């Protein structure tokens, strides 16, 4: 599904009522694009990946379960994800960006029920990146554990190799990026669970698919969409 730049943008969205999510396979650039959107549009980010990694380090029942699921490249249960997301949404205002949630239709329906019609998602960005590019990206991906900032040693490297630009702390590779079998499992899980979700949002008229393997070009398209539909 290619990006349709000829879509009718007659329905405008107020900047302070922008409720958006980014959907994409592992390595599609959700974190990278989220950070750019945060900077350019002053959007609070709720990053499910970062939240889950933080919870997985806790010695609790949920933490142990999440750590096991992440290590295997499996999805976290809908119930746990719903609790985590709603807890963070209660602390956020009317405008925000969800990074990596929902991941299946049931989660989307649960989110809609929680938000109700007046507060529903009004922009869903789908980052459509070829699988070969995804595999290359995760091999070159480095993250700052404390903030979740994502770097790529090829197309978005840190100023100093292996060092976070902001804090000066060391960067690391995610454990689920190192194992090729785990990565393949994550891709298949995405196809099985998340791709049907696109039809759900397409039917609601809020889906925008960006089919660019280049991160910078993809962000240009994202800005083109948002600048066309946002109003002060």
Curated annotation (Swiss-Prot):
PROSITE patterns: ADENYLATE_KINASE (PS00113). The keyword ATP-binding applies. Keywords: ATP-binding, Cytoplasm, Kinase, Nucleotide-binding, Transferase. It is found in: Cytoplasm. InterPro entries: Adenyl_kin_sub, Adenylat/UMP-CMP_kin, Adenylat_kinase_CS, Adenylate_kinase_lid-dom, ADK_active_lid_dom_sf, P-loop_NTPase. Transmembrane segments: none annotated. GO terms for biological process: AMP metabolic process; nucleoside triphosphate biosynthetic process. Disulfide bonds: none annotated. The keyword Ion transport does not apply. Catalyzes the reversible transfer of the terminal phosphate group between ATP and AMP. Plays an important role in cellular energy homeostasis and in adenine nucleotide metabolism. PANTHER family: NUCLEOTIDE KINASE. Monomer. NCBIfam families: adk (TIGR01351). This is Probable adenylate kinase B. It comes from Dictyostelium discoideum.
């Amino acid at each position: 599904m290619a990006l349709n730049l000829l879509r009718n943008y007659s329905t405008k969205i107020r900047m302070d009522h922008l409720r958006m999510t980014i959907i994409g396979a592992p390595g599609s650039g959700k974190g990278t694009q989220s950070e750019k959107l945060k900077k350019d549009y002053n959007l609070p980010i709720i990053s499910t990946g970062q939240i889950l990694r933080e919870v997985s380090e806790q010695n609790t029942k949920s933490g142990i379960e999440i750590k096991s699921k992440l290590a295997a490249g499996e999805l976290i249960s809908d119930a746990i994800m719903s609790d985590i997301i709603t807890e963070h949404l209660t602390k956020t205002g009317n405008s925000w960006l969800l990074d990596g949630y929902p991941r299946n239709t049931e989660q989307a329906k649960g989110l809609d029920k929680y938000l109700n019609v007046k507060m529903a998602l009004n922009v869903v960005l789908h980052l459509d990146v070829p699988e070969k590019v995804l595999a290359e990206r995760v091999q070159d991906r480095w993250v700052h554990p404390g903030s979740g900032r994502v770097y790529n040693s090829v197309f978005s490297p840190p100023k100093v190799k292996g060092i976070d630009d902001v804090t000066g702390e060391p960067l690391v590779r995610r454990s689920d990026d190192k194992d090729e079998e785990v990565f393949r499992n994550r891709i298949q899980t995405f196809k099985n669970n998340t791709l049907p979700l696109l039809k759900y949002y397409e039917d609601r008229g809020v889906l925008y698919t960006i089919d660019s393997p280049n991160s910078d070009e993809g962000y240009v398209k994202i800005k083109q969409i948002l600048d066309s539909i946002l109003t002060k």
